[in-house]
Design a protein with these regions (language model features):
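Juxtamembrane membrane-water interface segments immediately C-terminal to a transmembrane helix
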Residues: 29-63, 75
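Extreme N-terminal signal-anchor transmembrane helix of membrane signaling/transducer proteins, especially
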Residues: 1-41, 291-303
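Solvent-exposed, extracytoplasmic
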Residues: 78-94, 185-187, 191-233, 242-243
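Extracellular/periplasmic juxtamembrane segments that couple receptor/chemosensory ectodomains to their
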Residues: 182-185, 230-290
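Extracellular/periplasmic ligand-binding regions of membrane signal-transduction receptors
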Residues: 55-91, 99-105
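Short N-terminal helix-loop-first-beta-strand/juxtamembrane motif that initiates sensory/input modules
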Residues: 63, 90-108, 113-129, 154-160, ...
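Cytoplasm-proximal transmembrane signaling helix
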Residues: 17, 21, 218, 269-320
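Extracytoplasmic/periplasmic ligand-binding sensor regions of membrane-associated signaling proteins
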Residues: 123-195
């Protein structure tokens, strides 16, 4: 038969376990809500920063087009114009290509290749063949005014253009910013129109740079995703019937979704997915300190109580 001390000890163990389990359950219920709320707040904060950074990127492209225009002031000779554009492109790795419509309506295209070499295509007659530097025909009967970067933009306003098929890069999409030469600039430049195309690799790397390793970030134009960060490139992204995207991975991560247009550029949309609250997230470790402290206190109280009872029963046994 169990002694009175052992019976009391068993009851103390049961009470301790019940208290510990009740506390653990209550802690996880409360902390789960806190973690979820903190995740939403962090997602809002991160998305606000992402929006600003993406907006800065597109503004930089626009400023680059203006800088390119400034470098062409008073240049009338086509060789001087070519040298000026190539020099600027070497300083602007985020540009894939630059196109110029000269004041005589002839077209020049400066295209960056995989080895970072910039090749030049040009027209020797208006709407005629586009040829390379050796005179080889690249595109017959090329009409710049029929290209998407020209048709989608107004004759007076500078604008971004929807993604279109690059004629010099089969299977790839181009996104262009078109700069129109108007007013007094028209008298100082031998150019009527400039378009600059984004470098896709550079844009993807930029999204990598501004996002964290556990965040999914991509840009959309129309129904097409035009750029992704590293995690977005690794995951399966499925467009659903509700007009949103499902992020599929092997661990079924829950994400907080945030979307908006690029600041001051409604043509492009930002899709941002922040990982939902995780009770085991290292960023929440401070909330586990009170939990660990109370468990330790309960354990100490239990050990002290059993020790006191053991001593009392020992003294009673000695008296008997």
């Amino acid at each position: 038969m169990l002694s009175l001390y052992e019976k009391i000890k068993i009851r103390l163990i049961i009470l301790f376990l019940l208290a510990a389990l009740s506390f653990i359950g209550l802690f996880f219920i409360i902390n789960y809500q806190l973690v979820s709320e903190r995740a939403v707040k962090r997602a809002d904060s991160r998305f606000e920063l992402i929006q600003k950074n993406v907006g800065y990127f597109f503004k930089d492209i626009e400023r680059s087009a203006l800088t390119l225009k400034d470098s062409l002031y008073l240049l009338k000779n086509t060789e001087e114009i070519q040298r000026a554009v190539i020099l600027k492109m070497e300083m602007m790795p985020f540009l894939d290509s630059v196109g110029l419509v000269l004041d005589d309506n002839k077209y020049y295209l400066f295209s960056r290749r995989a080895n970072d070499k910039i090749v030049v295509y040009h027209q020797e007659q208006v709407n005629g063949p586009l040829v390379d530097e050796s005179g080889r025909v690249i595109f017959a009967d090329f009409n710049p005014s029929k290209r998407p970067w020209s048709m989608a933009s107004d004759d007076s306003n500078n604008s971004w253009n929807p993604a279109y098929n690059c004629f010099d890069r089969p299977g790839k999409k181009c996104i262009s910013f078109t700069l129109h030469i108007n007013g007094k600039d028209h008298d100082l430049l031998a150019v009527d129109k400039i378009h600059v195309d984004l470098n896709w690799r550079y844009l993807n790397e930029y999204l990598d740079h501004i996002s964290a390793n556990d965040e999914v970030l991509f840009l959309k134009q129309g129904h097409e995703i035009i750029a992704k960060n590293q995690l977005a490139r690794e995951k399966l992204i499925i467009y659903n019937s509700e007009g949103n995207y499902n992020i599929i991975d092997s661990v079924d991560t829950e994400y907080i979704e945030k979307t908006s247009a690029v600041p001051n550029n409604a043509l492009f949309e930002i899709y941002f997915y922040y990982p939902g609250g995780n009770l085991l997230n290292a960023s929440d470790k401070l909330f586990y300190l009170p939990f660990a402290f109370i468990i330790i206190v309960l354990l100490v109280v239990y050990l002290m109580t059993t020790r006191v009872f053991r001593r009392q029963f020992s003294e009673m046994t000695d008296l008997v």
